[in-house]
Curated annotation (Swiss-Prot):
<dbReference type="InterPro" id="IPR037041">
    <property type="entry name" value="Trigger_fac_C_sf"/>
</dbReference>
<dbReference type="GO" id="GO:0051083">
    <property type="term" value="P:'de novo' cotranslational protein folding"/>
</dbReference>
<keyword id="KW-0697">Rotamase</keyword>
<feature type="region of interest" description="Disordered">
    <location>
        <begin position="154"/>
        <end position="173"/>
    </location>
</feature>
<dbReference type="Pfam" id="PF05698">
    <property type="entry name" value="Trigger_C"/>
</dbReference>
<keyword id="KW-0132">Cell division</keyword>
<keyword id="KW-0963">Cytoplasm</keyword>
<keyword id="KW-0413">Isomerase</keyword>
<dbReference type="InterPro" id="IPR036611">
    <property type="entry name" value="Trigger_fac_ribosome-bd_sf"/>
</dbReference>
<feature type="region of interest" description="Disordered">
    <location>
        <begin position="444"/>
        <end position="478"/>
    </location>
</feature>
<feature type="domain" description="PPIase FKBP-type">
    <location>
        <begin position="173"/>
        <end position="258"/>
    </location>
</feature>
<dbReference type="Pfam" id="PF05697">
    <property type="entry name" value="Trigger_N"/>
</dbReference>
<dbReference type="GO" id="GO:0015031">
    <property type="term" value="P:protein transport"/>
</dbReference>
<dbReference type="GO" id="GO:0043022">
    <property type="term" value="F:ribosome binding"/>
</dbReference>
<dbReference type="GO" id="GO:0043335">
    <property type="term" value="P:protein unfolding"/>
</dbReference>
<comment type="similarity">
    <text>Belongs to the FKBP-type PPIase family. Tig subfamily.</text>
</comment>
<dbReference type="InterPro" id="IPR027304">
    <property type="entry name" value="Trigger_fact/SurA_dom_sf"/>
</dbReference>
Length: 478
């Protein structure tokens, strides 16, 4: 096998590979000899089939394996001999307009096998000194007021409702049980029908104006509710349209008294109110800590990004941009918006998000090298914990989810990647100065200028929610 490097420009490499016909012939004969004792052909005793006859029967299929193995061997030899770190799998190219002829002649052992191997390699760079980097960690502890607000919400959400006396009118805060059928321009639409639906008036669960028109209704009343779907409604086909709902009221119930006491705590599995307060405070604090971590990580990645400037593999940038851009287009579609609605153009947005893709690739390479240099590993136990956490998100489908990940190495790698990234981030945090800064809740949850979906090297962080206490209530209840 003859391998000649023909191109070495930046991160691109090209090699010309030639396997002479006589070498292919030798490889073919070797393979045929290897299968001689394994095949059974009528008229011949096992192991006594002449190689010439084997060649006549199996020659072309065996040669196909020989050619594939030769291509793989060439790739491995190039990478090993040159000490290359590949960005993506090698690309194999045959001379234009001659590919079929070359392959057919090689299959018949009548010609050389010649092809190009095109590679893209990872850049080499030195890890930067971070001793001069100082970043802020925003700190916020749950206040008694926030804990009490969460308890009040939990008490309200868990309160009981008692039927109002016969003929009583529904008031704001009451729960009504209704059947409804919605129509636009006289035609029913998908998702516009419901039976025995419980609705708390004033909760703003339904579209604006719907609940207000049921205040004063009695059991047995039939009402025509007229509303307009918001212009930014998530179902694009309904956004901005007028609709009418035929509503039948089947029950009216008044809310019971909300008490924050030991009985409330017991409803949430706690021994007493103090234990519930501790659980709520811990859950709210965990939510604040998660948001603080998200911002700390972004500031750290910003600092890292400013420390490095090296060539990026174009193919990796292209892949990353394609993934980011698909998210952008899907988001616009879901919201029924255009680039013009957002005050920009498609071209300007593409330029902006290409820079974001480049940042993500650059930071991904930096974090990978930091992890490799520091010998950071993710154990199988840690991956299993992440897998079981994911499985718990799909009650009733546990076995299907488990089998999916165990039979899909790529999916399992996607569970491992954020674990590795967080370990690397922790390692880097140990190399910089972290200064704690007490802040308000508003400051902690203030949005950054850069889109949240693309702040990190791997974009694994979720967008934070202002309703952190609601999430904390769920955690405390769980």
């Amino acid at each position: 096998m003859q391998v000649t490097e023909t191109t070495s420009e930046g991160l691109k490499r090209e090699f010309q590979v030639l396997l002479p016909a006589n070498e292919l012939e030798d490889r073919l004969n070797t393979e045929l000899s290897n299968i001689k004792g394994k095949v059974q052909i009528k008229g011949f005793r096992p192991g006594k089939v002449p190689v010439a006859h084997l060649r006549k029967v199996y020659g072309k299929s065996v040669m196909a394996d020989v050619l594939q193995n030769a291509v793989n061997e060439a790739n491995q030899q190039i990478v090993s001999d040159k000490g290359l770190r590949l960005a993506l799998e090698p690309q194999i190219e045959f001379p234009k307009d001659e590919e079929q002829t070359i392959i057919e002649r090689a299959l018949d052992a009548k010609g050389d096998l010649a092809f190009k191997v095109k590679l893209e390699v990872l850049p080499s760079f030195e890890l930067a000194d971070l001793s001069d980097v100082s970043i802020k960690k925003l700190v916020l502890k749950p206040s008694d007021e926030e804990v009490n607000e969460t308890l009040e919400r939990m008490a309200k959400d868990s309160r009981s409702f008692e039927p109002r006396e016969e003929g009583a009118e529904a008031q704001s805060g009451d729960r009504v049980t209704i059947d409804f059928v919605g129509r636009i321009d006289g035609t029913e639409f998908e998702g516009g029908k419901g039976e025995d639906v419980d609705l708390e008036l004033g909760s703003n669960t339904f579209i604006p104006g719907f609940e207000d028109q049921l205040v004063g209704a009695k059991v047995g009343d039939a009402r025509l509710v007229k509303v307009a779907f918001p212009a930014d409604y998530q179902a694009e086909q309904l956004a901005g349209k007028d609709a009418e709902f035929d509503v039948t009221v089947k029950a009216v119930a008044a809310p019971g008294e909300t008490k924050i006491d030991d009985e409330l705590a017991k409803r949430f599995g706690m021994d007493d109110l103090e234990k519930l307060k501790e659980a709520v405070s811990k859950a709210v604090g965990a939510d604040y800590e998660a948001q603080s971590r998200r911002k700390l990580k972004k500031e750290l990645l910003d600092a890292l990004d400013g420390k490095y400037a090296f060539d990026l593999p174009p193919s990796l940038v292209h892949q990353e941009f394609a993934a980011v851009w698909a998210q952008v287009e899907q988001d616009l579609k879901n919201r029924g918006k255009t680039f013009e609605d957002e005050g920009t153009t498609e071209e300007a947005s593409q330029a902006e998000y290409r820079k974001i893709a480049e940042r993500r690739v650059r930071l991904g390479l930096v974090l990978a090298q930091v992890g490799e240099t520091a010998d950071i590993k993710v154990s199988d136990d840690e991956v299993n914990q992440a897998l079981f956490a994911r499985i718990r998100q799909f009650p009733g489908q546990e076995k299907q989810v488990y089998d999916f990940y165990r039979n899909n190495p790529q999916a399992l790698a996607e569970l491992r990647a954020p674990l590795f990234e967080e370990k690397v981030v922790d390692h880097v945090l140990g190399q910089v100065q972290v200064v704690e800064e007490p802040v308000s809740k508003e400051a902690l949850f203030a949005e950054d200028d850069e889109a949240d979906a693309v702040t990190g090297a791997a974009a694994t962080d979720e967008k934070p929610s202002e309703s952190s206490n609601e999430a904390a209530a769920d955690k405390a209840a769980g």
